[in-house]
């Protein structure tokens, strides 16, 4: 009985928290990713005008994920969510070749912000199930990720609807959090 109590206490005390900001251009799949992680299922989404926030429990870490709308008119509001962000998830529609430069500009603009200087960067190269999707290496090149010399970053190929790659991304974030201590 004491062992059960000890394990429970250890799990309660040992739980870590990580504040995650998930952004990207509109229709990249941010909300679908959030609810696939939270509920394990696909939900019908509409364009996010404000934000969605959910807590995702994974590997004894409580990820508080802020999913903020990506339409161009509301992107200036992203900066209001920067404070205390430990991890940034930037979601890219791997099939949207026409807007990948726009995605790069938005990402670089954000990464220049002082409030995000210590945040680690996880890029989800989403929609990998589509036949014309750019692979992770191509997205890495087009986003200029190799130029990020002083920031921990990782790119993960994902498919939000199937869940492929999502937990691998969370694994990387979890390891980053553990290494910060």
Curated annotation (Swiss-Prot):
One of its GO terms (cellular component) is extracellular exosome. Its main location: Golgi. GO terms for molecular function: GTP binding; GTPase activity. Keywords: Cytoplasm, ER-Golgi transport, Golgi apparatus, GTP-binding, Lipoprotein, Myristate, Nucleotide-binding, Protein transport, Transport. A lipid is attached at residue 2 (N-myristoyl glycine). GTP-binding protein that functions as an allosteric activator of the cholera toxin catalytic subunit, an ADP-ribosyltransferase. Involved in protein trafficking; may modulate vesicle budding and uncoating within the Golgi apparatus. Interacts with PRKCABP. Interacts with PI4KB and NCS1/FREQ at the Golgi complex. This is ADP-ribosylation factor 3. It comes from Homo sapiens (Human). The gene is ARF3.
